[in-house]
């Protein structure tokens, strides 16, 4: 029903079923994992009105499992990428895996999937740092480049009284640069690939 993928490792499709509605994947050497993808295999959909809460568990310094809610998968959203690298020192949250006897080893974390009502999923709050940024690196680069250019150009701003007339030099009013900057930001927000047209 589910699959789990860590970059550079084989895809896991054989989740350990620990209860009728609970599944876990082991993540050996979890200290070296930054992101994990959880997805539905497409062979068995969730029953109508159901989805799966996705949890990350790692052993604390005493070997006690710390569970943190990452997010969810549903028939309408059959896959999700989660950033887990920053979660390994956080606090746990409420989870449905507490009373289960799940075999653990010290350097193995787990991804847990709990099949629950969609209404219940909508009320849960995942750990904030688990979400992968929806802004791609190109958009981030473009935004940083815009900010850098505007700040650089603005650092040379002079009032007309401060200017020394030089007929061989052109000048661009700062308000024109600001207008371009705001226009570019607006267009980038509407369509990050607008520059390709």
Curated annotation (Swiss-Prot):
Predominant location category: cytoplasm
GO biological process, one term: cellular response to heat
Region span, Required for F-X-F-G repeats-nucleoporins recognition and nuclear import: 18-55
Tissue occurrence: Expressed in the central white matter of newborn and adult brain, particularly in regions where oligodendrocytes are generated.
Pfam families attached to this UniProt entry: Hikeshi-like_C, Hikeshi-like_N
Source organism, top-level taxon: Eukaryota
Cysteine disulfide links: none
InterPro entries: Hikeshi-like_C, Hikeshi-like_N, OPI10
Compartments, record wording: Cytoplasm; Cytoplasm, Cytosol; Nucleus
Record has Secreted as a keyword: no
Positions of region (Flexible linker region involved in nuclear import of HSP70 proteins): 124-134
Gene Ontology MF: a single term: nuclear import signal receptor activity
Gene deletion effect: Mice display severe emphysematous enlargement of the distal respiratory sacs at birth. Club cells display enlargement and disorganization of the Golgi complex and formation of aberrant vesicular structures.
Keywords from the UniProt entry: Cytoplasm, Nucleus, Protein transport, Transport
GO cellular component: cytoplasm; cytosol; nuclear speck; nucleus
Subunit organization: Forms an asymmetric homodimer; required for binding and nuclear import of HSP70 proteins. Interacts with ATP-bound HSP70 proteins. Interacts with NUP62 and NUP153 (via F-X-F-G repeats). Interacts with HSPA8.
Similarity annotation: Belongs to the OPI10 family.
Chain's role: Acts as a specific nuclear import carrier for HSP70 proteins following heat-shock stress: acts by mediating the nucleoporin-dependent translocation of ATP-bound HSP70 proteins into the nucleus. HSP70 proteins import is required to protect cells from heat shock damages. Does not translocate ADP-bound HSP70 proteins into the nucleus. May also be indirectly required for organization and/or function of the secretory apparatus in Club cells in lung.
Name of this protein: Protein Hikeshi
Source organism of this protein record: Mus musculus
Gene: Hikeshi
């Amino acid at each position: 029903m589910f699959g789990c993928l860590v970059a550079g490792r084989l895809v896991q499709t054989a989740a350990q079923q620990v209860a009728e509605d609970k599944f876990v994947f082991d993540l050996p050497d979890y200290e070296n994992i930054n992101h994990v993808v959880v997805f539905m295999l497409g062979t068995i959909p969730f029953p109508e009105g159901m989805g799966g809460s996705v949890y990350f568990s790692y052993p604390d310094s005493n070997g006690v499992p710390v569970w943190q809610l990452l997010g969810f998968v549903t028939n309408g959203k059959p896959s999700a990428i989660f950033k887990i690298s920053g979660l390994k020192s956080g606090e746990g949250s409420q989870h449905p895996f507490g009373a289960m006897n799940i075999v653990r080893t010290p350097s193995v974390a787990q991804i847990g999937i709990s099949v629950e009502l969609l209404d219940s999923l909508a009320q849960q709050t995942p750990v904030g740092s688990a979400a992968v940024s929806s802004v791609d690196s190109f958009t981030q680069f473009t935004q940083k480049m815009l900010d850098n250019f505007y700040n650089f150009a603005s650092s040379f701003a002079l009032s007309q009284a401060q200017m020394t007339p030089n007929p061989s030099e052109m000048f661009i009013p700062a308000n024109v640069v600001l207008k371009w900057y705001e226009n570019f930001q607006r267009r980038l927000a509407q369509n990050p690939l607008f520059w390709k047209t």
